[in-house]
Regions:
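Flexible, non-catalytic linker and terminal segments flanking ANL/adenylate-forming cores
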Residues: 1-16, 37
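Conserved AMP-binding/adenylate-forming core of the ANL superfamily
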Residues: 13, 33-87, 104-109, 160-169
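AMP-dependent adenylate-forming
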Residues: 20-45, 151-154
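Structural motif
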Residues: 73, 119-121, 145
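Structured binding elements
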Residues: 93
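Conserved ATP-dependent adenylate/AMP-binding module captured primarily in the ANL superfamily
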Residues: 101-134
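ANL superfamily adenylate-forming
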Residues: 126-176
Length: 176
């Protein structure tokens, strides 16, 4: 039995999760959004700081050519950079493909290749090694972004740091 439902409520829905995040940044800018381990203590990040970082990273992804609905991989354990990367992918209009850090190199390559990931966020040297060892099976991956700056191995710039990605976005989309 069909019901008569007024569809006008659809116009009042938030368009997507990225917009929900940006709305929260606007409403709660100075409040704590995340707390994460740093050295021997804990650091806090406000909603505004998170929003600024996500915007930089999303702009960086766009500068790398990410198009709507293109896949971006994240091979990492749970950490605040994972959250920021995922939000950046959504804000850039992409879609996230996740890979457990315990996944072996062959399965990691299959997951990322099958989903045609263009960019992959990699937590550390262990994740980067899997990707570099299987690079021939990853024809779509144009760039690997590492969360740990020490992991940015010199390989002809296939691997860049999170900071380098943010800088790419900053350079391309800077408002003067």
């Amino acid at each position: 039995m069909a019901r008569n439902i007024d569809p006008s409520f659809v116009d009042q829905l938030t368009p997507n999760f990225a917009q929900l995040f940006l709305d929260r940044v606007a409403k709660s800018g100075s409040l704590e959004a995340y707390r994460f381990p740093q050295g021997s203590g804990w650091e806090s990040m406000t909603w505004q700081q998170a929003g600024d970082r996500v915007t930089q990273l999303a702009a960086g992804l766009l500068s790398l050519g990410i198009q709507p609905e293109q896949r971006v991989g994240i091979a990492s354990s749970t950490r605040y950079e994972w959250i920021l990367a995922d939000l950046a992918v959504m804000c850039a209009g992409g879609a996230t493909t996740t890979v457990y850090p315990s996944t072996n190199a062959e399965d990691t390559a299959y997951i990322l290749s099958d989903s045609e990931c263009q960019v992959v966020f990699a937590e550390d040297d262990d994740q980067i090694k899997k990707l570099t060892d299987m690079r021939a099976q990853l024809p779509s991956v144009a760039k690997v972004v590492t969360f740990d700056a020490a992991s940015a191995q010199d390989d002809g710039d296939w691997v860049i740091t999170l900071e380098a990605l943010a800088d790419l976005g900053e350079k391309r989309f800077r408002i003067e």
